[in-house]
């Protein structure tokens, strides 16, 4: 099922019983977080708070609170279908040379489809139905959540940030949290390796001292939102990928105050500039780790213009100790990652990011082991192949007889197939999420790889244990007489 905009998605979710309207007045300060957290843990519906206390704009929460709704947002009917999206991305990331003329013709429709999904620029758009500029700009009109008791200020969480580097042809989309610090000021918390930060750095080098244009789209259609958090190949724009998911070209409109292009159907758009050198301390905020992060300095965006649809919807979320929405997104996107990794490492059978590991900090990989040291090659590959895993602290590699998604299996493999000294890989001074306060230096720490595979000659000189396997005939016999035994 495809959705033309956020409102279409909301309508379809409501028809399926996947969205609940809350008419009782609810405060964006703490109350919405508590309600959304309880609902998410119960695998409940998306929530539309129609009467947020003190505001006229409704708040949409828990939108991607189940893997099934994430799959729906990506145009899939089931989570299992996300593997096919991963296969497409794997192909586009590293297309294989055709094996012959017939193979070349068979692949041609894929490239035609990608080319056909180039975004379409329109002259008029719903996101600019209402325009607020200059002294009339007031971020206080938005029902921005204060999620946790220790949060320093309201926090914009689902803003789709649009930037463009001076040396790049296409725009970058990224989702960075934004602290509101004034009627027209927000802090842009982008980490140094993220696309927006890199674009801004390049701008400062090429245009020193000049203001840098930025736009933030709130309430885009689900395909565009999810396209921004998916490992899209550098050769494919997030807008084009969203078109592939949606089955129709992404409509964009030029911002009123810059050449940046934003989703035409977005509910709300913030337009502004970052003045080089204008920084502010961000935080503390409760984060996906389950802790409050330390205070750090980031650029300030001066909002010069707010445009929005008539009767807009404000899309919001919270982050906290898993499960939260980022963890649920991780569970769904896990299925997209698997084919991409398998294209590079065909020996990988499964790849799993346990949600309790804060979405990406731990990975479990099962492989068809082929030679001594194979597990170490795979763990090094996980850390280096995709940017999404540069912050993964722990990689556990097991044989394919282990279920990567069953901790009973994984712990059994670790405790029976590992020698802590021989089978542990430690790497110092690697990139680490600055929110990881356990690292000795902000943004820099170590990684651990655990080789929980059966050891081959060359890895051990001892006779290796053989796993106990039940006798099939006995199992069938007991199956036949089980009900007669009266044990259950």
Curated annotation (Swiss-Prot):
EC class (word): lyase
Subcellular localization: Cell membrane
Principal cellular location given in the protein's record: membrane
Keywords per UniProt: Cell membrane, Decarboxylase, Flavoprotein, FMN, Lyase, Manganese, Membrane, Metal-binding, Ubiquinone biosynthesis
Catalytic activity: a 4-hydroxy-3-(all-trans-polyprenyl)benzoate + H(+) = a 2-(all-trans-polyprenyl)phenol + CO2
Co-factor note (free text): Binds 1 prenylated FMN per subunit.
Residue numbers binding prenylated FMN: 175-177, 189-191, 194-195
UniProt name for this protein: 3-octaprenyl-4-hydroxybenzoate carboxy-lyase
